[in-house]
Amino acid sequence: MGSCKPKKKQAPCFLRRRHLRRLNVCKRDTSKTYRRRRHVRRLPKKRRRRC
């Protein structure tokens, strides 16, 4: 239950980055926080850019 599993069809990084909140694809703390509560803290730009 820790990290979300990658989807079968993975969008290009820019796409994933753009809809990060909706797709919940990133294997970072975002995925965990996303499930717990709707409101997710935005990560700093450097971290957010990495998919």
Curated annotation (Swiss-Prot):
One GO CC term, this protein: nucleosome
Tissue expression remark: Testis.
Main location: nucleus
GO annotation, biological process: cell differentiation; chromosome condensation; spermatogenesis
Coiled coil segments of this chain: none
Record localization: Nucleus; Chromosome
Highest taxon above the source species: Eukaryota
GO molecular function, one term: DNA binding
SS bonds (residue pairs): none
Region (Disordered): 28-51
Segments of skewed composition (Basic residues): 33-51
Key words of the record: Chromosome, Developmental protein, Differentiation, DNA condensation, DNA-binding, Nucleosome core, Nucleus, Spermatogenesis
Cited function: Protamines substitute for histones in the chromatin of sperm during the haploid phase of spermatogenesis. They compact sperm DNA into a highly condensed, stable and inactive complex.
Designated name of the protein: Protamine-Z1
